[in-house]
Swiss-Prot record:
Keywords linked to the UniProt accession: Endoplasmic reticulum, Fatty acid biosynthesis, Fatty acid metabolism, Heme, Iron, Isomerase, Lipid biosynthesis, Lipid metabolism, Lyase, Membrane, Metal-binding, Prostaglandin biosynthesis, Prostaglandin metabolism, Transmembrane, Transmembrane helix
Protein name: Prostacyclin synthase
GO MF annotation terms: heme binding; hydroperoxy icosatetraenoate dehydratase activity; iron ion binding; monooxygenase activity; oxidoreductase activity, acting on paired donors, with incorporation or reduction of molecular oxygen; prostaglandin-I synthase activity
Gene Ontology biological process terms, A to Z: apoptotic signaling pathway; cellular response to hypoxia; cellular response to interleukin-1; cellular response to interleukin-6; decidualization; embryo implantation; icosanoid metabolic process; negative regulation of inflammatory response
InterPro entries tied to this protein: Cyt_P450, Cyt_P450_CYP7A1-type, Cyt_P450_E_grp-IV, Cyt_P450_sf, PTGIS
Location in or out of the cell: Endoplasmic reticulum membrane
Originating organism: Mus musculus (Mouse)
Superkingdom of the source species: Eukaryota
Membrane topology of this protein: Single-pass membrane protein
Main function: Catalyzes the biosynthesis and metabolism of eicosanoids. Catalyzes the isomerization of prostaglandin H2 to prostacyclin (= prostaglandin I2), a potent mediator of vasodilation and inhibitor of platelet aggregation. Additionally, displays dehydratase activity, toward hydroperoxyeicosatetraenoates (HPETEs), especially toward (15S)-hydroperoxy-(5Z,8Z,11Z,13E)-eicosatetraenoate (15(S)-HPETE).
Organism phylogeny: Eukaryota, Metazoa, Chordata, Craniata, Vertebrata
């Protein structure tokens, strides 16, 4: 062996000894500490491979709170839903989401905003997504869903069309959402402008989808050289498609877009960075609706009883309306709010497939009180992680047969929404958490729910839809998506559909 090789080996051994000598020890009052067997890396490989399975094993070993070493970071994981409120409503001076959000914003979207304050941004966006302008957004989304779905079906004719269910759902919802938030070709609309809207929004979707597929690797910094080149090309294309200059000529732009662009200009953000911010917002506002609709429709197609119940509810609701759905230019909120069966199906779908990480950076040494009276010390500089996918959403103590889709799980016997779920004999406040909670709950929740329900209504009233094969199975999750919102399937599910004449 050469001297160079020996020196290299010695350096590696010295580095390992240094890392081992600096390994953290658990202090009195702290959660159980699990460092794994690999210095510095700790459990990073297991966590990245399948976070849900890894955290399930850790919970079985240590209980509902523990600290693990993951790639040089100490992450305290809390899996007691009774104690979540303590975390999600804690002051930012103690537990803060912002540093992690800024880290992901820069790593995934190459976005740097001067004096960025997520709380101020949320306050600016809240009226345009939740209260003042929600009705206008909902009406515009319905119009654009009709443009995307019914225009395509008219052009395609009455025959059966074959595609993938995820491709179909994701394309329709993101395309319509893009037109709703970022504007349309012309107003008033013509057949020609609507055809251009379909082409342009489909281009946005297919380009965005390429970035979406790379998102987990971008977040973890694990892109190959080829992936990096592809990601760079896709981002540049999206920045051009969503540049403020290109969007300036679009009609019927949402008040959300106008308000957000004013906010960026007031911060002194360059047009280049504004385009990057708009790509980020496209993902934040639209990235989960398509996958949600995919799982919801798949569960309905695999469960005839559930599909029949939704159809019966829709028929009853529409019968009470003043005109048939096929003639409605808008779907009134009172109709959307009168679908408890569809609401239960949506909640059950989200329970089974929504798997975001709720993270906070520990800004100061603090004591974390648990709902059962215990108290644990957290260290400044660590990260705190909640994973509601494991508990409450898949907790067998809360839900019987938690792996099974039950369309009426969130319905009481009288047909009203069920909200009473229990763990350890106590009623849960947080029994299903697909939208986050506390200071960082999703602002677009109502808009997203309305959009998904409108999509399902249009699909069931205007199309025949069936699986490509009777023995189609529900696909496994793409395990790399844990932590990023809605799970996506390992592979798409073939379907066929046709417009009803």
């Amino acid at each position: 062996m050469s001297w160079a090789a020996l020196l290299g080996l010695l350096a590696v051994l010295l580095l390992l000894l240094l890392l081992l000598s600096r390994r953290r020890a658990r202090r009195p009052g702290e959660p159980p500490l699990d460092l794994g067997s690999i210095p510095w890396l700790g459990h990073a490989l297991e966590f990245g491979r399948d976070a849900a399975s890894f955290l399930t094993r850790m919970k079985e070993k240590h209980g509902d709170i523990f600290t693990v070493l993951v790639g040089g970071r100490y992450v305290t994981v809390l899996l007691d839903p009774h104690s979540y409120d303590t975390v999600v409503w804690e002051l930012r001076t103690r537990l803060d989401f912002h540093p992690y959000a800024i880290f992901l914003m820069e790593r995934i979207f190459d976005l740097q905003l001067p004096n960025f304050n997520p709380s101020e941004e949320k306050a600016r966006m809240k009226p345009t997504l939740m209260h003042r302008d929600l009705q206008a957004l909902t009406e515009a989304m319905y119009t654009n869903l009709r443009t995307v779905l019914l225009g395509d079906s008219t052009e395609a004719g009455s025959g059966w069309q074959e595609t993938g269910l995820l491709e179909f759902s994701y394309n329709a919802l993101l395309s319509a959402g893009y037109l709703t938030l970022y504007g349309v070709e012309a107003s008033p609309r013509t057949h020609e402008s609507q055809a251009q809207d379909r082409v342009h929004s489909a281009d946005v979707f297919h380009t965005f989808r390429q970035l979406d597929l790379l998102l987990p690797k971008l977040a973890r910094g694990s892109l190959s050289a080829g992936d990096k080149d592809h990601a760079c090309s896709v981002k540049n294309r999206l920045w051009k498609l969503l540049s403020p200059a290109r969007l300036a000529s679009r009609a019927d732009r949402s008040s959300w877009l106008e308000s957000y662009l004013r906010h960026l200009e007031e911060m002194g953000v360059s047009e280049e960075m504004q385009a990057r911010a708009l790509v980020l917002q496209l993902w934040a506002t639209q990235g989960n609706m398509g996958p949600t609709a995919f799982w919801l429709l798949l569960f309905l197609l695999k469960n005839p009883e559930a599909l029949a119940a939704v159809r019966a509810e829709l028929k009853h609701t529409v019968w009470q309306a003043e005109q048939p759905v096929s003639q409605m230019t808008t779907l009134p909120q009172k109709i959307l709010d009168s679908m408890p069966v569809l609401d239960s199906v949506l909640n059950e779908t989200l329970r089974l497939t929504a798997a975001p990480f709720i993270t906070r950076e520990v800004m100061a040494d603090l004591a974390l009180p648990m709902a059962d009276g215990r108290e644990f010390s957290l260290r400044r500089g660590d990260r705190l992680l909640l994973f509601p996918f494991l508990s409450p959403q898949k907790d067998p103590e809360i839900y019987t047969e938690p792996e099974v889709f039950k369309y009426n799980r969130f319905l009481n016997p009288d047909g009203s929404e069920k909200k009473d779920f229990y763990k350890d004999g106590k009623r849960l406040k947080n029994y299903n958490m697909p939208w986050g909670a506390g200071h960082n709950q999703c602002l677009g929740k109502s808009y997203a729910i309305n959009s998904i329900k409108q999509f399902v209504v249009l699909l069931l009233t205007h199309f025949d839809l069936e699986l490509g094969s009777e023995d189609t199975e529900v696909p496994e999750f793409d395990l790399s998506r844990y932590g990023f919102g809605l799970m996506q399937p390992e592979e798409d599910v073939p379907i066929r559909y046709r417009a009803r004449l």
